[in-house]
């Protein structure tokens, strides 16, 4: 996939995210240092759940933002190295923060349709 197609997939995801407003949203976040083996035992995981209220793109810092009540989550657009739809209403972003530090963000929307 070329860079423009990859970028367009991410843009399309955020252009259509408003259909999930009001939906329960799960974000599973993992920090790891070895994307080749991706050993779950060597990855630090966090889980957050909230109702998605709004989303936006913050030009300062190139951040993709999702917000819920008492919850705010950002993904660095310029650090995304992978984006895929894992299933119906399930998505995964991988950001690279240094040579060997990666953040995996799995998003699941509990969407009624």
Residue ranges: model-predicted function:
Residues 1-17, 21-113:
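Short beta-rich binding modules
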């Amino acid at each position: 996939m070329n860079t423009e197609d990859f970028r367009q997939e991410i843009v399309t995801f955020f252009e259509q995210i408003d259909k999930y407003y009001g939906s329960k949203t799960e974000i599973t976040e993992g920090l790891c240092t070895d994307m080749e083996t991706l050993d779950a035992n060597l990855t630090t995981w966090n889980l957050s759940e909230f109702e998605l209220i709004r989303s936006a793109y913050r030009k300062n810092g190139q951040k993709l933002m999702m917000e819920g009540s008492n919850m705010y989550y950002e993904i660095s657009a310029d650090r995304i190295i992978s984006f895929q739809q894992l299933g119906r209403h399930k998505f995964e972003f991988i950001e690279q923060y240094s040579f060997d530090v990666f953040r995996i963000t799995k998003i699941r929307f509990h969407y009624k349709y």
